């Protein structure tokens, strides 16, 4: 198991996975079928971001969906403030239900879309996973990144990343 996943944090991650799978049975918020898939393809995918988060960061997670990486970051970095941006009502319901069940006082769920003229705050970190192209994310959030802030984007295959970076 990863060093970040131990003790109380491991219990919270386990509870989160179980809640996500149960909710997913009726509401189809992601494509994983079992706990092992969620752990191996979602939770472990988010862990490299955790190491890049400093203490007391203000983080915006775009298109939070099933809580990856936003809820995972909130559990593993409880001293950081996490804003989960999601446009889907059912996904916001799930995120709020999960936040309350896990007593994540560092999480706010924002039910909204984002555009270039948004009035969101400034963040030290902006994350996204399967939200949009790198170029589109940069265009939509350029006014929301603090000076010396950074993007932590989970984008998948190297070929796709190279293609998106070339398009910028």
Which residues does each predicted region cover?
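N-terminal cationic-hydrophobic initiation segments that often serve targeting/anchoring roles
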Residues: 50-51, 74, 142
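Class I SAM-dependent transferase core
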Residues: 1-56, 60, 90-107
């Amino acid at each position: 198991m990863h060093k970040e996943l131990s003790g109380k944090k491991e219990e919270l991650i386990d509870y989160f996975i179980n809640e996500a799978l149960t909710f997913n049975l009726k509401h189809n918020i992601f494509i994983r079928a079992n706990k092992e898939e969620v752990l191996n393809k979602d939770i472990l995918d988010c862990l490299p971001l955790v190491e890049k988060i400093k203490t007391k960061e203000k983080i915006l997670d775009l298109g939070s969906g099933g809580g990856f990486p936003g809820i995972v970051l909130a559990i593993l970095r409880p001293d950081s403030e996490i804003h989960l941006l999601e446009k889907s009502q059912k996904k916001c319901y799930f995120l709020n239900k999960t936040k309350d069940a896990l007593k994540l006082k560092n999480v706010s769920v924002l039910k909204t879309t984002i555009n270039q003229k948004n009035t969101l705050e400034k963040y030290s970190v902006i994350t996204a996973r399967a939200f949009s192209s790198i170029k589109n994310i940069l265009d939509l959030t350029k006014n929301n990144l603090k000076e010396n802030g950074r993007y932590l984007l989970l984008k998948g295959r190297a070929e796709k990343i190279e293609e998106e970076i070339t398009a910028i």
